[in-house]
Curated annotation (Swiss-Prot):
One of its GO terms (biological process) is leucyl-tRNA aminoacylation. This is Leucine--tRNA ligase. It comes from Escherichia coli (strain ATCC 8739 / DSM 1576 / NBRC 3972 / NCIMB 8545 / WDCM 00012 / Crooks). ATP binds at K622. It is an enzyme of class 6 (ligase). Keywords: Aminoacyl-tRNA synthetase, ATP-binding, Cytoplasm, Ligase, Nucleotide-binding, Protein biosynthesis. The lineage of its organism: Bacteria, Pseudomonadati, Pseudomonadota, Gammaproteobacteria, Enterobacterales. It holds the Pfam family Anticodon_1. GO terms for molecular function: aminoacyl-tRNA deacylase activity; ATP binding; leucine-tRNA ligase activity. The keyword Ligase applies. It is found in: Cytoplasm. GO terms for cellular component: cytosol. Its EC number is 6.1.1.4.
């Protein structure tokens, strides 16, 4: 064994061994308990960042630990390879998205291997390959036949100059990111999957997810947004149709003083024919990108349509306004407004001088003061005719019943959740497998024409999708009739909604899933990824699992038993102000800092002499130039050091502050272990441990070893507090470093301790542990070694510490055998000089003894 720890030498050797032995490849084995450990698959952006490293290290630690418990562990990896960034990069680098993507995959695969992650590479998949997306296309056609897929027009961001659809992130301050033209909202036909058909199940089954974070479940509950209310129909004077609204507060209905409709509503369109102001307003709304998140903060605007609706219960005429806070794609495109009891309606009514009618009393029973704001709390009705005096629940039911009896109301359960729009007007995605025949019939692409392959050898102009620009690509024949293929591609959330299931049978050619393999491995035992995926990916992931279950492919209701959301990785951020007042962000690697006595940064500059402003720790990002390249750190310290720091610096679900001093500390710890094993093995062979012949000190050290095994096992396995597990190992290492090594049993005990330490550290730092296990002559490869088991007998304390008090004041602490009687403890206490002097010449009037803990002698 060499004296110095050289990670650059041992890590490449160990990785080569894993590759050659195919150590982490697994197959179904009914004789073994399975464990499926999965980290969210990466987008092949070009380089790994520290967020990836943290996510995948957590997953690898769990997978390696479960493997050492004797389970059949599946830990696969793949690439979420479609998506918009590849199109931008292709244009910028004058290439096509496919070669850019495949080059990135090759580079990042090497980076993952360099970090020593124990993946089953035989199951690697890339979602941009026809071998993968063909099954998604087939499944989509089956969902269409089941009535779960439909096409309707929906609003998109449209650049009139480039004649193309823009993703939300390509709209900057209302303009096209590329040509700065003002963006319009345009209605175009798009494909949808009926996720709303599963809304109740998606909501109710959240209760089955005992090991998912409550925050994620709450976010999904709110996103699904189940509400119970009443749908109410209004007649409108001089208008051919009625208006329908939905409300969750029918108790406030007597306070409805106006209706508001979306700018795109047929009523608003009709009114605009003779109203130039309204026509201009509709035009303005059409050119505004309105995401739901922005609705709450934007200025509320509207124009009176001139139409009057009739309140079904009072018979009063109330105005109908077109308003920018109502969207056609939500509900009916019309809402009832109760300005006395809804703050948004109140602000709008105040702005335009509309009637505000209070109908709910304040909590103290007085009429509400509406001079500053609406009263939004529930309460008792007044000003409501026959419903006066009713509380919220009674009024809800009475008004709902009356409207229903009149034929103008219907109780409804509504959802905030909308059907999933899966059409994207982009190139780099899986083609949607639908065709339109010459006679206008729309139908799924026949099975014998699947997959519909995306051409990869294309020229990108940065404006139009190559498959939209090439009229020949869309041409096909179905049943002998000319037809045109759909040129939209799938939302990339489609691919990431079922990849976890395909990992169970990536080579299967008979269908989407091999049910036997899928049902052996599924559900996933632990799924690891960022909380930013709480409502989009993780909802579609659950939805797809239920679709596959209903298609007979899987037999479980949910895709993952446990979800672990790792915290973000933070780093110091610095900038200097440029000549034009702009902020120039400087990498923390290039910052020369001065610190105070507490280690806080008080001054910083860069190599060019710029005075730097320190903004504190923030999420590693390109925009703040504070990302730390994992590859540089691995080359400097080794993969094991980086992995150990990642797991030790913070609990897995909390933010992690990147500190290179902490990385250096992790590296020093690994060097200490290496040195201890080197010194131990240099002394030659070790005798067998005789546990019956140990001294008290040896027993105490062995007790510490086995208590550490018990704690680390609990911390990793049950609590998943990996940082405290490492801290416990470090504490034990400090004791081992001071332990005597001269005697035969000292060395035998050290051998047992080091074999345990190396196995406990193996999930965290597998390369050094692989090597040290060999040097310690552990049996076989450590990858197949069992997890150490704490010896219950070794942990039993044979002595205990008893506090001795005289008249309630502590006078001594004594060590006694655990089975000592009260008499023996009193006798031992009396031998202590500090106790004896207080007992001299006095009478012990009372003895209070708490066995094994406390002896209090009351004297007088």
């Amino acid at each position: 064994m060499q004296e110095q720890y050289r990670p650059e030498e041992i890590e490449s050797k160990v990785q080569l061994h894993w590759d050659e032995k195919r150590t982490f490849e697994v197959t179904e084995d009914e004789s073994k308990e399975k464990y499926y450990c999965l980290s969210m698959l990466p987008y092949p952006s070009g380089r790994l960042h520290m967020g990836h490293v943290r996510n995948y290290t957590i997953g690898d630690v769990i997978a390696r630990y479960q493997r050492m418990l004797g389970k059949n562990v599946l830990q696969p990896i793949g690439w979420d390879a479609f998506g918009l960034p590849a199109e931008g990069a292709a244009v910028k680098n004058n290439t096509a998205p496919a070669p850019w993507t495949y080059d990135n995959i090759a580079y990042m695969k090497n980076q993952l291997k360099m970090l020593g992650f124990g993946y089953d590479w035989s199951r690697e998949l890339a979602t941009c390959t026809p071998e993968y997306y063909r099954w998604e296309q087939k499944f989509f056609t089956e969902l269409y036949k089941k009535g779960l897929v439909y096409k309707k027009t929906s609003a998109v961001n449209w650049c009139p100059n480039d004649q193309t659809v823009l993703a939300n992130e390509q709209v900057i301050d209302g303009c096209c990111w590329r040509c700065d033209t003002k963006v319009e909202r345009k209605e175009i036909p798009q494909w949808f999957i009926k996720i709303t058909a599963y809304a109740d199940e998606l909501l109710n089954d959240l209760d089955k997810l005992d090991h998912w974070p409550d925050t994620v479940k709450t976010m999904q509950r709110n996103w699904i947004g189940r509400s119970e209310g009443v749908e109410i129909t209004f007649n409108v004077n001089d208008y051919d149709n009625t208006l329908t609204v939905y409300t969750t507060r029918p108790d406030t209905f007597m306070g409805c003083t106006y209706l508001a409709v979306a700018a795109g509503h047929p009523l608003a369109q009709k009114a605009a024919e003779n109203n130039p102001e309204l026509a201009a307003f509709i035009d303005e709304c059409r050119n505004t990108k309105v995401a739901e998140a922005e609705m709450a903060t934007m200025e509320k605007k509207g124009v009176d349509t001139g139409f009057k609706a009739v309140h079904p219960l009072t018979g009063e005429e109330i105005p109908v306004w077109a308003a920018n806070f109502v969207l056609m794609e939500y509900g009916t495109g019309a809402v009832m407004a109760v300005p006395g009891h809804d703050q948004r309606d109140y602000e709008f009514a105040s702005k335009y001088g509309l009637n505000i009618k209070p109908v709910i009393l304040a909590a103290d029973g007085s009429e509400p003061d509406l001079s500053q704001q609406a009263l939004t709390e529930k309460g008792v009705l007044f000003n409501s005719g026959e419903f006066n005096g009713l509380d919220h629940e009674a009024a809800f039911n009475a008004i709902a019943d009356k409207l229903t009896a009149m034929g103008v109301g219907e109780r409804k359960v509504n959802y905030r959740l909308r059907d999933w729009g899966v059409s994207r007007q982009r190139y780099w995605g899986a083609p949607i497998p639908m065709v339109t025949l010459e006679d206008g019939t729309v139908m799924p692409t026949p099975d014998d024409q699947l997959p519909v392959i995306l051409p990869e050898d294309v020229v990108m102009d940065g404006i139009t999708s190559p498959i939209k620009a090439d009229p020949e690509w869309a041409k096909t024949t179905v049943n002998g009739m000319p037809a045109l293929r759909e040129t939209d591609t799938f939302d990339t959330f489609m691919e990431s909604s079922w990849y976890y299931a395909r990992y169970t049978c990536p080579q299967y050619k008979e269908g989407m899933l091999d049910s036997e393999a899928a049902n052996y491995w599924l559900p996933v035992d632990i799924y690891i990824g960022g909380i930013e995926h709480a409502i989009m990916h993780l909802l579609y992931f659950r939805f797809f699992h239920k679709l596959m279950r209903d298609a007979g492919m899987v037999n479980s209701d949910e895709p993952a038993k446990q979800l672990l959301c790792q915290g973000m990785v933070l780093a110091d951020a610095f900038y200097y102000v440029g000549e034009n007042g702009e902020r120039n962000w400087v990498s923390p690697v290039d910052a020369i800092v001065e610190r105070d006595e507490k280690g806080r940064i008080v001054k910083a500059k860069d190599a060019a002499g710029h005075e730097l402003v320190y903004t504190g720790m923030s999420k590693m990002s390109k925009s703040k130039n504070n990302g730390i390249d994992p590859q540089v750190m691995v080359e400097r310290y080794g993969a094991d050091t980086v992995r150990l720091f990642m797991m030790f610096a913070s609990p897995a679900d909390m933010t992690l502050e990147w500190q290179e001093s902490g990385v250096e500390g992790a590296n020093r710890f690994l060097k200490r272990i290496w040195k201890l094993v080197y010194e131990h093995t240099a002394k030659g062979d070790v005798a067998a441990l005789n546990v019956d012949a140990l001294t008290e000190d040896q027993k105490a050290l062995r007790r510490d070893v086995h208590k550490t095994i018990a704690k680390v096992t609990d911390d990793i396995g049950r609590r998943q507090t990996f940082n405290t597990a490492i801290a416990a190992i470090m504490e034990l290492m400090n004791k081992l470093a001071k332990a005597p090594t001269d005697g035969e049993q000292d060395r035998a005990l050290m051998q047992e301790a080091l074999l345990a330490v190396v196995r406990m550290l193996n999930p965290f730092t597998p390369h050094i542990c692989f090597t040290l296990w060999q040097e310690l002559k552990g049996e076989g490869d450590i990858d197949n070694a069992p997890w150490p088991v704490a010896d219950e007998k070794a942990m039993v304390e044979d002595s205990t510490l008893v506090v001795v008090q005289v008249n309630g004041k502590v006078r001594a602490k004594i060590t006694v055998p655990v089975d000592a009687t009260e008499e023996q403890v009193r006798e031992r206490a009396g031998q202590e000089h500090l106790v004896a002097k207080y007992l001299d010449g006095v009478t012990v009037r009372k003895v209070i003894y708490v066995p094994g803990k406390l002896l209090n002698l009351v004297v007088g």
